[in-house]
Amino acid sequence: MPTYAPKAGDTTRSWYVIDATDVVLGRLAVAAANLLRGKHKPTFAPNVDGGDFVIVINADKVAISGDKLQHKMVYRHSGYPGGLHKRTIGELMQRHPDRVVEKAILGMLPKNRLSRQIQRKLRVYAGPEHPHSAQQPVPYELKQVAQ
């Protein structure tokens, strides 16, 4: 019997909603990245995008352990001399908490031809509401140790 090789149209995609309230950022990112890639499915293949859609709500209430809010820096460069911009995670969490969560999740995805396609299935919202109720997302529970 030949080995089963999934094709792009063979997979059925579901929608999951993850509540980020009091969840450690790294553990949230790992769970979301696995859902986006489809590693929880028996038909997983690394060369086919078979993952599901993921909605992350309450990104402003995510837990960042240790003193990373004050000391972990995020860098960007404009491309011009002297164009290095740096901010702490705490400053970014005040302005754009959804971008901090999104950057953590996207950093755990592979950097290959499928990455853009996988990234389009991620939606992150700072508050508790999201506009995807028509897709009937299933709540995804993260198992974590109490903090």
Swiss-Prot record:
Coiled coil: none
A biological process term (GO) from this entry: translation
Spans annotated as Disordered: 128-147
Database matches in PROSITE patterns: RIBOSOMAL_L13 (PS00783)
Molecular functions (GO terms): mRNA binding; structural constituent of ribosome
Alphabetized SUPFAM superfamilies for the sequence: Ribosomal protein L13 (SSF52161)
Family in the record: Belongs to the universal ribosomal protein uL13 family.
Official protein name in the record: Large ribosomal subunit protein uL13
Organism for this UniProt entry: Mycobacterium tuberculosis (strain ATCC 25177 / H37Ra)
Name of the gene this protein is made from: rplM
